[in-house]
Structures are given as structure tokens and as C-alpha cells.
């Protein structure tokens, strides 16, 4: 899409999680970009699923039930059970956060967007962000003024680009 539309990207952002970094590296390879600055930020990380981290969906449903898993995945302000100190992924998480709701995710994504990304958009720069479903939901909620009731219903397909064009005063075109 970037090549098709002949878009020159001015700044690249991603989370600190391996899958988003890998996605960005694939994009950079396709774009024949090898010497660019990549802004990696924990604030763009996927929502922290606490004790559910590392479990696949089927195993999680077997353990907690489909209804409860759906509540954790799609509610706005309900957190999954917190990550235990003995959890195998606990050492990989650099913050003291033990579990997050989408509401919590918004509280870290939006300030980062306001401070680091929005000024570049205001300066008419083209930005590419490789990140995750819930951090993307948080940003879309802000940009498009989407209600919390509607944002939890958004399905964001993995690996599909989303092009947002801004006009004057950062209005979405």
C-alpha cells in the first residue's frame, strides 16, 4: 500500500514487543529501507493480559469459560486476573503493571501519541506505526472520537494496513 500510493514515510514507531518489531522489519524490507530510526515504545505495547499472558485462546476458554474470556477480551474497563510473580513471562515485563483493561491501555497510549506522534502529524509528516489490536483501538478511539461502547466491538484484523489521512487542524479526511 505504501509503495502503491508512493508514500514517503518520515517516522517509524512500534511497540517493544517482538511481533510488532518483526512486522515493522518486514515492512522496512519491502520498502527497501535499512537505515532508518525506529522509535520503540512500551506505551504502544499490547494490552497486558495478566495471568492470561502466553495462554492460547482455547486453553484459556477451557480454564475460565468462554463467557468470562470474552468479558476480559472485549470489555472496556475489566482487567483479567493479575500476573502472578511466578509467571514464566513476569521477568520479561519491565513495568509494575500486572494486568490491564482497554481503559488502562488508553491511559498510556494517548499521552505517548500526544507527545511523540501528534506533533509530527501536525508538521505534515507521514508516520508508520506497527503495533497491536488494543493499542490500535486506543488510538482509533482518540482520533475518531469513538465511544467506549463502540470501540470494544471493533475487529482489527492482524496484518492489515490502516491508512489515516489528516487535514488541517488534524481533522481526519
Describe each PLM feature range:
Residues 9, 28-29, 96-98, 129-135:
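A generic short-segment signal for beta-strand/edge and adjacent turn/coil regions
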Residues 21-22, 35, 103, 107-172:
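Active-site-adjacent alpha-helix immediately C-terminal to a catalytic or transition-state-stabilizing loop
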Residues 84-86, 90, 120, 124-125:
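Short helix/loop segment immediately N-terminal to the Walker
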Residues 14-17, 62, 99, 106-107, ...:
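Generic detection of long, well-ordered alpha-helical segments
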Residues 2-85, 89, 141-165:
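Phosphate-coordination/substrate-recognition cap region in phosphate-metabolizing enzymes
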Residues 79, 90-106:
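Surface-exposed cleft-lining segments at the edges of enzyme active sites
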Amino acid at each position: 500500500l505504501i509503495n502503491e500510493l508512493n508514500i514517503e514515510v518520515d517516522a517509524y514507531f512500534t511497540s517493544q514487543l517482538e511481533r510488532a518489531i518483526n512486522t515493522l522489519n518486514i515492512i522496512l524490507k519491502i520498502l527497501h529501507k535499512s537505515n532508518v530510526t525506529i522509535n520503540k515504545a512500551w506505551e504502544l505495547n499490547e494490552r497486558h493480559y495478566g495471568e492470561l499472558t502466553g495462554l492460547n485462546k482455547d486453553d484459556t476458554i477451557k480454564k475460565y469459560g468462554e463467557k468470562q474470556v470474552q468479558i476480559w477480551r472485549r470489555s472496556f474497563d475489566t482487567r483479567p486476573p493479575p500476573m502472578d510473580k511466578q509467571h514464566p513471562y513476569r521477568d520479561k515485563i519491565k513495568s509494575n503493571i500486572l494486568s490491564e483493561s482497554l481503559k488502562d491501555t488508553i491511559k498510556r497510549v494517548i499521552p505517548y501519541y500526544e507527545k511523540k506522534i501528534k506533533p509530527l502529524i501536525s508538521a505534515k509528516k507521514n508516520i508508520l506505526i506497527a503495533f497491536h489490536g488494543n493499542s490500535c483501538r486506543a488510538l482509533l478511539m482518540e482520533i475518531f472520537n469513538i465511544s467506549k461502547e463502540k470501540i470494544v466491538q471493533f475487529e482489527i484484523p492482524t496484518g492489515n494496513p490502516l491508512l489515516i489521512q489528516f487535514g488541517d487542524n488534524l481533522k481526519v479526511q
